[in-house]
Amino acid sequence: QTALALAQLPFALEAKTEEELVQLMAGAASALREAGCALVGGHTCEAKELGLGMAVTGYMPGGSKAAMRKDALQAGDALLLTKPIGTGTLFAADMRAKARGPWVIDALQSMGTSNGPAASIVHEHGALACTDVTGFGLAGHLLEMCRGSKAFVALDLEKVPLYEGALDCLRMGITSSLQPANVRLRRAVANHDAVCGHASYPLLFDPQTSGGLLAAVPKARANACLEALRSSGSAPLAAIIGEVTG
């Protein structure tokens, strides 16, 4: 596996820019090495804000048939989520100096955890369908899987893991700027009127940064998969949040 980097550095004195680039690339190379990937080149430019993007190449052992896909949900599968949700509202609150330090620290620690080990575990336990939860929120990415698989799912809102402080931020009326666009997906929720009053319901549409994996695992192996995720330390807050109903 190899990666090419696009680094965007803020305008500054040359010495300052060089130091930022060294630190940025050192961190990126370290994370890539942990994933068995080599940084082989890239491009650097100056802009108003710091930014870093990667173009990564890799291969799938066993070929494409071994890949976990978005469109492979099967009736009876259990839905597992490997990380809590709520980063959107937490960091929107942090920008307003409304989030408590421990909330942000806990979220950052989770965000810094690679999904690689968790992906291996769910694959070993028979997962055929899997995606990562990012900007479209849990509801948006689950809807992608449902549409691609022509399937229906049932979620248990009480089981969805939340970052500490996420509900507090919601109570303050703070949400991400991307939340309104994601909320439009509520039309896909069959019983919206019955569940929209649940405290954590808005977090289904909360955009995630470095979110966890949403995987469908055969029901008979779901509990063993959950235990493996938690005991390995790769996903200590993983949870079974629902099932594929048809």
Regions found by a protein language model. Give the residues of each.
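Glycine-/charge-enriched secondary-structure boundary and capping motifs
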Residues: 16-38, 45-52, 124, 131-246
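Short pre-catalytic strand/loop immediately N-terminal to key active-site residues, enriched for Gly-Thr
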Residues: 102-110, 128-129, 200-205
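Short, compositionally biased
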Residues: 91-107, 232-235
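Short, hydrophobic/aliphatic alpha-helical segments
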Residues: 74, 114-127, 198-199
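Glycine-rich anion-binding loops of enzyme active sites
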Residues: 2-100, 242-243
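Active-site glycine-rich loop that binds ribose-phosphate moieties when present
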Residues: 55-67, 102-122
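Short, contiguous, pocket-lining structural segments
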Residues: 46, 86, 106-114, 130-134, ...
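Hydrophobic faces of well-ordered beta-strands that scaffold small-molecule active sites
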Residues: 3-5, 129, 153
